[in-house]
Regions:
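Short, solvent-exposed, charged loop/turn and helix-capping segments
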Residues: 90-115, 128-140
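Short, charged, amphipathic alpha-helical segments
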Residues: 37, 41, 72-83, 108-115, ...
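Immediate post-signal-peptide N-terminus of mature secreted/exported proteins
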Residues: 30-84, 185-192
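Extracellularly exposed regions in secreted/surface proteins, prominently low-complexity, repeat-rich
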Residues: 33-51, 141-193
């Protein structure tokens, strides 16, 4: 199984890069804007379970790849993980959509851009699931080659998602989100620091 091992590691690394963007909803500040705070709470409460789902999907892929598993097992795990991620990003997009525009300058554009990006990421993960499902698990070299292509797509995907949310979380929106307990616990760093 040595043939696919470096590729699997690359895949796992690309994936964890993608998950970081959802888990990056933390920072610190304390200005008061009730409307914005209630918007942030609404989004954060919805994001938290999805962030956990993405984290679990990542963990599953990393476990499968570090165990030097057979191609068929890697395929099965990756396929489920990509489906979970697709669902999670769709749900986060829906949450941002339903929350309406945050009460800041240009809030509507920020919101719409983020929703558009999140939906696009959801679709991209669904496409990766289809790609991984089609890989030939009987031919190890071909399987490794296919995974390499998927890892490349993931790199791009994590970057675009990161940009979408970075934009939404700029300024007061990010500060309001940082104060929400659910966003703190969804973040990759332990709260209480």
């Amino acid at each position: 199984m040595e043939g696919t091992d470096p590729v699997n590691k690359k895949l796992a690394a690309a994936l964890s890069g993608g998950a970081v963007l959802v888990l990056a909803l933390s920072g610190c500040s304390d200005d008061s804007n009730d409307k914005l705070n209630s918007w942030a709470k609404q989004v954060c409460d919805k994001v938290q379970p999805q962030a956990k789902k993405i984290e679990s999907a990542n963990a599953a892929i990393q476990k499968e790849t570090s165990d030097n598993s057979a191609p068929a097992d890697v395929q099965k795990t990756d396929s489920k993980a990509f489906q979970d991620m697709s669902d999670a990003y769709k749900a986060i997009g829906d949450a941002v959509d339903k929350a309406g525009a945050p009460n800041v300058d240009g809030g509507e554009k920020k919101q719409q851009d983020a929703v558009k990006e999140l939906d696009k990421i959801s679709t991209s993960y669904a496409d990766l699931k289809k790609q991984v499902d089609k890989l030939d698990t009987d031919d190890q070299a071909k399987f490794a080659e296919g995974l390499k292509g998927i890892a490349g797509s993931l790199d791009k995907l994590s970057q675009s998602g990161s940009d979408a949310l970075k934009n939404l979380e700029e300024g007061d929106v990010g500060k309001a989100m940082a104060k929400q307990e659910s966003c703190k616990s969804a973040s990759a760093t332990p709260s209480g620091s």
